[in-house]
């Protein structure tokens, strides 16, 4: 009905539940039990259905997926669970076999930016940065734009980018230990780093700042574009890709990150 649509648009529809998680890198069993399994025992307040939306569902731990399995197998007639993900391969086969898969196309960047501008008190730069990183996923864009954890992650990445060239061996080892605190969000860490060096490469090639993502760091970006060769920038981007592959193959985390920082230091 019209009332439900208005409530849904404003975020006040009690029968549409967005599942939140405290840890930025994972959705744990307690999150699932409290916000889905337990809550689903309560019938809808005003609607025919009660809908649970788990964004970034690829972050569900194995324990959380197992806890969710019985509810997915035998939900109440009014219960609907929507798992939003960019990587269905992270789900247990028992989960996948009990779900209906629907593929969504990414939203246009203009729509994501417009949504952020209308719904949140953000600068134009913050909206455009979140949009660029989210790649058409509006929920992801909201998380990036509003999460203190993501802002801190970005600062950690920028610290390495600023100072890798001057780091001593001891400082590199200390930084590796610091980055280990971000194991659960290492993909975001590496993606941010790759975005930076792509910006440097683009600016070095074109001297055009309009297409850049890190516009708030123009002086540093221009300096690195001037001082680093094309080959050096390409080597850094290749090193980041290698890190992702090695981590998926369970190569030692500290060793892989140490080699990455050393590659950046040598290239700069």
Name what the model sees in each region.
Residues 6-7, 77-78, 87-192, 196-268:
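Charged, glycine-rich active-site and insertion segments that engage polyanionic ligands
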Residues 3-63:
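Clamp-loader machinery-focused feature within the broader ASCE/P-loop NTPase space
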Residues 31-34, 66-69, 95-98:
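Short, glycine/charged-enriched secondary-structure capping and boundary segments
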Residues 52, 56, 60, 64, ...:
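Helical "lid/switch" subdomain of P-loop NTPase nucleotide-binding domains
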Residues 18, 83, 101-103:
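Structural signal for conserved beta-strand scaffold positions within catalytic alpha/beta enzyme cores
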Residues 66-83:
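Conserved catalytic/switch belt of AAA+ P-loop NTPases
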């Amino acid at each position: 009905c019209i009332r439900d649509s208005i409530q849904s648009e404003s975020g006040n529809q009690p029968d549409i539940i967005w599942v939140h998680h405290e840890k930025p890198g994972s959705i744990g069993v307690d999150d699932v039990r409290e916000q889905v399994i337990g809550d689903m025992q309560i019938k809808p307040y005003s609607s025919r259905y009660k809908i649970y939306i788990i964004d970034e569902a690829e972050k569900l731990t194995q324990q959380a997926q197992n806890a969710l399995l019985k509810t997915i197998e035998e939900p109440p007639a009014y219960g609907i669970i929507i798992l939003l993900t960019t990587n269905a391969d992270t789900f247990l086969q028992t989960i996948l076999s009990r779900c209906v898969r629907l593929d969504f196309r990414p939203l246009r960047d203009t729509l994501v930016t417009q949504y952020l501008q209308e719904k949140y008190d953000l600068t134009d730069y913050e909206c455009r940065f979140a949009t660029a990183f989210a790649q058409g996923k509006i929920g992801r864009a909201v998380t990036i734009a509003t999460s203190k954890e993501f802002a801190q992650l970005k600062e950690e990445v920028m610290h390495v980018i600023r100072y890798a060239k001057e780091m001593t061996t001891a400082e590199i080892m200390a930084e590796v230990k610091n980055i280990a605190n971000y194991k659960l969000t290492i993909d975001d860490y590496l993606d941010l780093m790759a975005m930076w060096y792509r910006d440097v490469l683009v600016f070095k090639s074109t001297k055009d700042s309009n297409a850049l993502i890190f516009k708030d760091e123009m002086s540093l970006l221009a300096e690195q574009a001037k001082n680093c060769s094309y080959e050096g920038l390409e080597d850094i981007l290749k090193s980041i890709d290698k890190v992702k592959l090695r981590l998926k193959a369970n190569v030692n985390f500290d060793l892989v990150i140490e080699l990455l920082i050393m590659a950046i230091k040598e290239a700069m």
